[in-house]
Structure formats: structure tokens, C-alpha cells
UniProtKB/Swiss-Prot annotation:
GO MF annotation, one: alanine-glyoxylate transaminase activity
Lineage: Eukaryota, Metazoa, Chordata, Craniata, Vertebrata
Keywords for the protein's UniProt record, in alphabetical order: Coiled coil, Glycoprotein, Glycosyltransferase, Golgi apparatus, Membrane, Metal-binding, Secreted, Signal-anchor, Transferase, Transmembrane, Transmembrane helix
The protein, known as: Alpha-1,3-mannosyl-glycoprotein 4-beta-N-acetylglucosaminyltransferase A
GO cellular component terms attached to this protein's record: endoplasmic reticulum; endoplasmic reticulum-Golgi intermediate compartment; extracellular region; Golgi membrane; Golgi stack; peroxisome
Membrane association type: Single-pass type II membrane protein
PANTHER family: ALPHA-1,3-MANNOSYL-GLYCOPROTEIN 4-BETA-N-ACETYLGLUCOSAMINYLTRANSFERASE A, N-ACETYLGLUCOSAMINYLTRANSFERASE VI
PTM summary: N-glycosylated.
Catalytic activity entry: N(4)-{beta-D-GlcNAc-(1->2)-alpha-D-Man-(1->3)-[beta-D-GlcNAc-(1->2)-alpha-D-Man-(1->6)]-beta-D-Man-(1->4)-beta-D-GlcNAc-(1->4)-beta-D-GlcNAc}-L-asparaginyl-[protein] + UDP-N-acetyl-alpha-D-glucosamine = N(4)-{beta-D-GlcNAc-(1->2)-[beta-D-GlcNAc-(1->4)]-alpha-D-Man-(1->3)-[beta-D-GlcNAc-(1->2)-alpha-D-Man-(1->6)]-beta-D-Man-(1->4)-beta-D-GlcNAc-(1->4)-beta-D-GlcNAc}-L-asparaginyl-[protein] + UDP + H(+); an N(4)-{beta-D-GlcNAc-(1->2)-alpha-D-Man-(1->3)-[alpha-D-Man-(1->6)]-beta-D-Man-(1->4)-beta-D-GlcNAc-(1->4)-beta-D-GlcNAc}-L-asparaginyl-[protein] + UDP-N-acetyl-alpha-D-glucosamine = an N(4)-{beta-D-GlcNAc-(1->2)-[beta-D-GlcNAc-(1->4)]-alpha-D-Man-(1->3)-[alpha-D-Man-(1->6)]-beta-D-Man-(1->4)-beta-D-GlcNAc-(1->4)-beta-D-GlcNAc}-L-asparaginyl-[protein] + UDP + H(+); an N(4)-{beta-D-GlcNAc-(1->2)-alpha-D-Man-(1->3)-[beta-D-GlcNAc-(1->2)-[beta-D-GlcNAc-(1->6)]-alpha-D-Man-(1->6)]-beta-D-Man-(1->4)-beta-D-GlcNAc-(1->4)-beta-D-GlcNAc}-L-asparaginyl-[protein] + UDP-N-acetyl-alpha-D-glucosamine = an N(4)-{beta-D-GlcNAc-(1->2)-[beta-D-GlcNAc-(1->4)]-alpha-D-Man-(1->3)-[beta-D-GlcNAc-(1->2)-[beta-D-GlcNAc-(1->6)]-alpha-D-Man-(1->6)]-beta-D-Man-(1->4)-beta-D-GlcNAc-(1->4)-beta-D-GlcNAc}-L-asparaginyl-[protein] + UDP + H(+); an N(4)-{beta-D-GlcNAc-(1->2)-alpha-D-Man-(1->3)-[beta-D-GlcNAc-(1->2)-alpha-D-Man-(1->6)]-beta-D-Man-(1->4)-beta-D-GlcNAc-(1->4)-[alpha-L-Fuc-(1->6)]-beta-D-GlcNAc}-L-asparaginyl-[protein] + UDP-N-acetyl-alpha-D-glucosamine = N(4)-{beta-D-GlcNAc-(1->2)-[beta-D-GlcNAc-(1->4)]-alpha-D-Man-(1->3)-[beta-D-GlcNAc-(1->2)-alpha-D-Man-(1->6)]-beta-D-Man-(1->4)-beta-D-GlcNAc-(1->4)-[alpha-L-Fuc-(1->6)]-beta-D-GlcNAc}-asparaginyl-[protein] + UDP + H(+)
Protein family per UniProt: Belongs to the glycosyltransferase 54 family.
Length: 536
């Protein structure tokens, strides 16, 4: 009997292990396939961008030829003798071409005309590394000469030492030396080659620097926003450094993340970044933020870099990089006829913040001479007491009294948890979508590790369909219709409410959590996930 029981137990362990391995393998294969599809998609978009760029180049060359013909005709003063040796057909063609007044399309040379004076102004003057491509994440680290202390080696060690062997094959770290003094650049390269010989030799690390001809004259810039002449020059050059680095990095991977040369990274930062991006693969985001400070930890999709660089180059003399990034979002989604709150909601769908922060600023001495910079990211060491999801744009409201700034708006955006004082019957939490949305699933989780008892009880989940004349409903669904037009589709059990939305109720105008009875405890809502239908 013991032998038989032991055999059964062994068989169960074997089957459980086999099923677990099968599930994990399928899950891992699914992730890898998604990354492969993303690579193919981004490669296709990149080829399209290159084709468009070449078309613009050919168009510019044609305009140059036509301008040459126009000058020839003007110099000939319309004399027939000047073109008498051409056939009638050729003369007619020249006349037709020179009479065309096509509009010129602005490009990088319009904003930086000095680049036309030298060949190779957009090619690195120094380039060290294997030129690795086809990775998931490209990390860009700009560095310049600091008078007091350089943090570059410590930054690179922090990033590299926290990568697994597999992760080291799926990324590339680009160090951009923003100096034109070749002697200094070569000294930095020599130090990096000595310290990181293995990483450079494997293709993990690359080092580049721009040619002196890439930079315009930075000595006669207009002073704006109360900044000194030196600070205006510093921030203007910084914008140009970012642009060169991003243009170089764009074709190397699926995502590009901007870092600085004076940071430290959290353990498992790479897998966290990659998995978070994969979760949002179906969302229309533009910036993922993995730090709240400046330009640190801002990640972009490779195809979006073209727009970002073009926008920065249009205004590189006017404002710092973080302001310009916010302006891009404003231009894309903000309606001048709406208020600032509506604008912030729209921008939050393009600019998604991950918490806690994955990178911490450690540099005390800024690259701007004489500036002491005591900036630290307060979210870096915080435990995560809420979960982050991207929800449909909505106006949120509640009858509950909020505690210590833990607002519903922040929770909906994935920035914090919602904390409110004791609910009573009739209290509600309302999510009114900016436009009707087809919803597949929902999840609301209350309580958190610090306050596990602060849960929602006796609370229902209601939805308001956009269509008022719904007839394609089962009788049990119709019975859940409330007098105000909402439909009751779920309730909280053990602090959790989750489920699907009947497809016949879609599209949905609003979600509501309704408190049915007085509660004896405060409530925390730490996770909100209203998942769109993927086909929406």
C-alpha cells in the first residue's frame, strides 16, 4: 500500500512538473514571438522611413537641377541661340520643367544649414565597438568633460553588473562623448577600453563622439527664461547631443531609453523595462518613464525617434529637452478648447510612468560648470503598494473623502493607490470615459500589504452602456438593469472584483463602484484595470 501511494505521489509530482514546464515554455515562447513580431514591424517602419528619406533626397536633387536650368535660362536672357542645338522636344521639356514652382520640404538642413558646409557632419568622428543591431533595448548615455568628478565608470558598472548573460545579448549601451577635443575623447575611449574590454569586444558597449562640424556657432544665442548666457549655451548643446545620440541609436533596436552618466540602476531593471513595454504593446504610448527626474529613464519606440528629433531640432535653441518633450505631447493630443485637466489626462495616455523608479541620480557636480545638483528620485527605494495598468482616458470622481492626497486620479493613472475614509451606503466611485469604449474585462483590487484590512465590502460594479435601446440581452442580464440606466455586472468578494463585460453592452460610457452598506473600515483601492477589447 505504501509503495502504491508513493508511486501515485511520484506520478503526480512528475505530471505537475511537466505541466508547469510546458506552461512556462509556452509563455516564454509567446513572449519571444511577440518580440520577434515587434522587431519585424519596427524594421518595416524603418525601411519605409528610409524610403521616404531617399525620396526627399531625390526630390531635393531634382530641385537643384531645375534651379540650375533656371539660372542658365536667365543668363541667356531668353535667347533662342542658347538652346538652338537642342531638339524641339528637349527645348519643350526644359521649358516645362523650369516653369514648375514646386514647394520645398523642410529637412534637418533647414534648421541646421551649417551641416551643408562639410561632408560627414552627421557621421561620428570616433566610433568604437561592433555596431550591434537587432536588440530589444538600446541604452544611450551622453557624457561630457566634468571639471570636478566623472561618474561614468560607476554608471556603466551599475548597468552592466545587473544584466544576466542572456540580457547582455539583447541590448547595447552607447556612450556618447559630447566633446570635439579629439585628444580628450581618445583619452576617455582608452580608459573605457581598458575598464570594459570584454563588453566592448562582445558588442554590448559602443563609444561614439560627434565631429566638430556637427555643432553650429553656440556663442551668440538668445538668452531666454532668465537663464545666463552660459546656461543657454549648455542646454542648447545638450539638446544637440541628445539628437545625435538618438539618430545613431534609432536603427539598433526596438526601444531606446535615455540615461545619464551619473546614475545607478536597480536590480532586474532590464527585465522590468522589457516586460512593462510588452504589457503595453497594444497601447498607443510615446514615452515610458522609469524615473521622475529630467530626461533620465525616458524610453521611446524606435520609429518615434524621427518625430522627436525633428521637433527638438526645430526648437533646440529655445527650451530645454524636458520642456520640448512635453510640448510634443501637447501638440499631439491637447485640445486648446478644453481645460488643462483634460489635456493632462490625454497626455497621460502617451506618457506612462512606471513606479517605483528604476534609476537613481547620484551625481553631485553637474556638467554645467559650478552647478551643485542635489537631485534624488524619492521613488527609487519605495516599495510598490499599487499595480500599474493603462486604462481608457476617463474623468474620475467619487463621493468618498480622500486621505492624505491619495487621489483617485493618481490611482487610475497608475501613480499611487486610492485611500479614503470610511464609506457609507450610497457612496460611489465613477469612471466616465472621454468617449465610449468596448471593454473586455475589468479588475478592481482593494487593500494593500501595509493595510490589508482596508478593503471594499458590499460594493457592486456597474456599467453604463452608450446605447440606450439595447434589445440583444438575455433575461438575466436585463434583470440587472438599474433605474438610472446602469447595469450591475459584478461585486467585490474578499476585496476583489473582476470579470468580463457582456459584449452586447458595449460600447461602455462609464464604470461605477457603488457602496450598498455602511463600512466599519477605511478603504484602499490599489489596482484598477479596465481592459479594452483588443479589436477596439
Amino acid at each position: 500500500m505504501r509503495l502504491r501511494n508513493g508511486t501515485v505521489a511520484t506520478a503526480l509530482v512528475f505530471i505537475t512538473t511537466f505541466l508547469s514546464l510546458s506552461w512556462y515554455t509556452a509563455w516564454q515562447n509567446g513572449k519571444e514571438k511577440l518580440m520577434a513580431y515587434q522587431r519585424e514591424f519596427h524594421a518595416l517602419k524603418e525601411r519605409l522611413r528610409i524610403a521616404e528619406h531617399r525620396t526627399l533626397q531625390r526630390s531635393s536633387e531634382l530641385h537643384a537641377i531645375l534651379d540650375h536650368f533656371r539660372r542658365m535660362i536667365k543668363e541667356a536672357n531668353g535667347s533662342r541661340d542658347a538652346f538652338s542645338h537642342f531638339s524641339d522636344e528637349t527645348q519643350k521639356l526644359i521649358k516645362d520643367l523650369t516653369n514648375r514652382k514646386a514647394l520645398q520640404v523642410p529637412n534637418i538642413y533647414y534648421h541646421m544649414p551649417h551641416l551643408l558646409n562639410h561632408d560627414g557632419s552627421l557621421q561620428p568622428a570616433v566610433q568604437v565597438g561592433l555596431g550591434r543591431t537587432g536588440v530589444s533595448v538600446v541604452m544611450g548615455i551622453p557624457t561630457v568633460k566634468r571639471k570636478v568628478k566623472s561618474y561614468l565608470k560607476e554608471t556603466l558598472h551599475s548597468l552592466i553588473d545587473k544584466l544576466s548573460p542572456e540580457e547582455k545579448l539583447d541590448c547595447v549601451i552607447i556612450v556618447f562623448i559630447g566633446e570635439t577635443d579629439l585628444e580628450y575623447v581618445q583619452s576617455v575611449v582608452a580608459n573605457l577600453e581598458k575598464e570594459f574590454a570584454t563588453e566592448i569586444g562582445s558588442g554590448l558597449v559602443e563609444v561614439i563622439s560627434p565631429p566638430a562640424t556637427y555643432y553650429p556657432d553656440l556663442n551668440n544665442l538668445k538668452e531666454t527664461f532668465g537663464d545666463s548666457k552660459e546656461r543657454v549655451r549648455w542646454r542648447t548643446k545638450q539638446n544637440l547631443d541628445y539628437c545625435f545620440l538618438m539618430m545613431y541609436a534609432q536603427r539598433k533596436g526596438i526601444y531606446y531609453i535615455q540615461l545619464e552618466d551619473d546614475i545607478v540602476a536597480k536590480q532586474n531593471y532590464f527585465s522590468t523595462i522589457k516586460n512593462f513595454a510588452l504589457q503595453l504593446s497594444s497601447e498607443d504610448w510615446m514615452i515610458l518613464e522609469f524615473s521622475q527626474l529630467g530626461f533620465i529613464g525616458k524610453m521611446f519606440q524606435a520609429p518615434d525617434i524621427t518625430l522627436i528629433v525633428e521637433f527638438i531640432l526645430m526648437f533646440y535653441k529655445e527650451k530645454p529637452i524636458d520642456w520640448l518633450l512635453d510640448h510634443i505631447l501637447w501638440v499631439k493630443v491637447c485640445n486648446p478648447e478644453k481645460d488643462a485637466k483634460h489635456c493632462d489626462r490625454q497626455k497621460s495616455n502617451l506618457r506612462i510612468r512606471f513606479r517605483p523608479s528604476l534609476f537613481q541620480h547620484v551625481g553631485l557636480h553637474s556638467s554645467l560648470a559650478g552647478k551643485i545638483q542635489k537631485l534624488t528620485d524619492k521613488d527609487f527605494l519605495k516599495p510598490l503598494l499599487h499595480k500599474i495598468h493603462v486604462n481608457p482616458p476617463a474623468e474620475v470622481s467619487t463621493s468618498l473623502k480622500v486621505y492624505q492626497g491619495h487621489t483617485l486620479e493618481k490611482t487610475y493613472l497608475g501613480e499611487d493607490f486610492f485611500w479614503a475614509i470610511t464609506p457609507v451606503a450610497g457612496d460611489y466611485i465613477l469612471f466616465k470615459f472621454d468617449k465610449p469604449v468596448n471593454i473586455e474585462r475589468y479588475l478592481f483590487r482593494s487593500g494593500n500589504p501595509d493595510h490589508p484590512g482596508d478593503q471594499l465590502w458590499n460594493t457592486t460594479v456597474d456599467v453604463l452602456p452608450y446605447r440606450k435601446d439595447i434589445v440583444e440581452l438575455r433575461s438575466d442580464t436585463k434583470e440587472n438593469r438599474l433605474p438610472d440606466g446602469f447595469f450591475r455586472i459584478g461585486k467585490f468578494e474578499d476585496g476583489l472584483a473582476e470579470g468580463t463585460v457582456n459584449s452586447n453592452l458595449n460600447p461602455i460610457s462609464a464604470f461605477r463602484l457603488s457602496v450598498l452598506h455602511n463600512s466599519a473600515v477605511w478603504i484602499i483601492l490599489n489596482e484598477i484595470h479596465i481592459k479594452r477589447n483588443p479589436a477596439d
